[in-house]
Amino acid sequence: MTVIYFVLAALALGFLILIHELGHLLAAKAVGMTVESFSIGFGPALVRKKMGSIEYRIGAIPFGGYVRIKGMDRNDKEISEDREKTVYDIPGGFFSKSPWKRIFVLAAGPLANILVALFAFGILYFSGGRTKPFSEHTSIVGWAHPSLEQKGLRPGDRIFLCNGQVYSGNKMAFSSSLLDRKLSLQGEHPAYFSEAESFSLDVPFNPSLEGVPCLGASYLLYRGSEPLPEKSPLIDAGLSEGDRLVWMDGALVFSGVQVSQILNEKKAFLRIERQGKIVFVRQSRVLAGDLQLTSYFKNELIDCQYEAGLKGKWASLYMLPYIINSDGFVESKINLLNTDQQSLDYHLELGDRIVAVDGIPVMSNADILRLVQDHRVSLIFQRMSSGQLSVLDQKAADKAFIDSYDMDDLLRVAGSVGEEREVSHLGEYRLVTRVQPKPWVHIYSEELLDKQRALASKFRDEQEKRYYLERIESEKQRISLGIPLKDLAVQYNPAPLVLMGESISDSLRTVKALGSGRLSPQWLSGPVGIVRILHTGWSMGIPEALSWIGLISINLAVLNLLPIPVLDGGYILLCLWESVSRRRLNMRLIEKGLVPFMILLILFFVFLTLQDLSRVFIG
């Protein structure tokens, strides 16, 4: 099937080039110009056939195509035979027509691409659109980069505007920050636990240096079609198909990345009595050897270690960065030895009493010390109905997501964590406590990483190869729940003109960012890369392929309309100047000026092709 998809991808790209050149051909014939040749590709002809006065060719270099119209250059045979003639004097020639007719012919190619895009988007719309993961186009945040979280963007927030445009998902946040080197966001903190509150933030952000700014929220569903690994910490949790993970250690969870972050943060989930009220906090667990401990407290810690039945050196024990008395009351905080290398957030207050650690009730500081050596998580799953699991229209999906919580029941279940009698079931919610997560490698087979290692070993750069191999090894040790969490599908079907507008806007912003130096050419693709993209689209189904065909067709139109010599837009600019100035063009001067631009364009396409090939063969 891969070969078939590759052939379909190559044919799709060839079709878009064909349509572009066909637009020029039909327009030229319509205004009475004489067309000499019609070629798909440049260089020596692999196939040629003359039909009437036009020679049709397929060139050896698949970088585009051209329509050769009589009299387009000074080397035309009629000019060579008569030195007094100019390109303007050739009957049926390109320059024999008025500037506006020439502009019509030049614009016909990009216009044909725009019509193809509109047609592709129209078919997509009237066939029902595409089925996409909810996370891909939601305005709800599933995870936020730490720099954005510090500015107030949190998982679960809803974004309305991104850099002045209506927000359409995390891909928009990435592209906007890539092109503008900043993010200006407006949205709201939805009413999950309290009243909804508006927010806005404006922060510099460069994804080339900082990575992905945010991810979309996901439903985190256990579908049941993929069984749990035998060594999964949740193997005996009694999960059923359609169960959704909604809460973990005191927080609503909105994405797999957020779940992984909570699992790997080395924090304990504490139930606290504070001034007669129950509060929950997540507090860092710190190695005792990293804290400023007096000799007296070291001896106290060793006594507590003995009482808790813990072996090993006291410095290798995890503890909370506080002095806690035998009844579990917080007496004071303990500072780090080296504050330059790390910092701590202190969430406990003087007089707080710790009554449970990771959902397990405690009676003494020895119980606390014993339990903070490992991290057990408390989880709440929501039993989703068949109606809630059905495919929704993307426009209604965000509201359905926010409305899917019964916060009264959820808060009652969550508030019971650490009580002697927990509320294990209430309504559609079920509490699962004392789950012991494990390193990934202790749950799954290491053979699953062999493919990633093989890809990393292909890198020619030794430093880059070592980086990726080390990253694979570190990922093995990441703490995991051992559960495949899937997203809910939504029907994504914007109107054709909306897709057209977004595509044109993105293309123009990309050109602007390239020209200003904010965007590196490494983010671009040439013919090989476009075929790979179309190959991926075909492999995902006809709707996805239609979407990419429309998008690439729009990009071809925008590219050709750029006011750069040798492109359609450059010639249009010359014709406009001729029309305004009422003076004929100096073709000798123009042809000399075109040479460096032609060389630069060829070098640019060669660079993109080599870059695409390196992605294929190196990674």
From Swiss-Prot:
InterPro entries: Pept_M50_Zn, Peptidase_M50. It is a multi-pass membrane protein. Keywords: Cell inner membrane, Cell membrane, Hydrolase, Membrane, Metal-binding, Metalloprotease, Protease, Transmembrane, Transmembrane helix, Zinc. One of its GO terms (biological process) is proteolysis. Its EC number is 3.4.24.-. Zn(2+) binds at H20, H24. Belongs to the peptidase M50B family. This is Putative zinc metalloprotease TC_0344. It comes from Chlamydia muridarum (strain MoPn / Nigg).
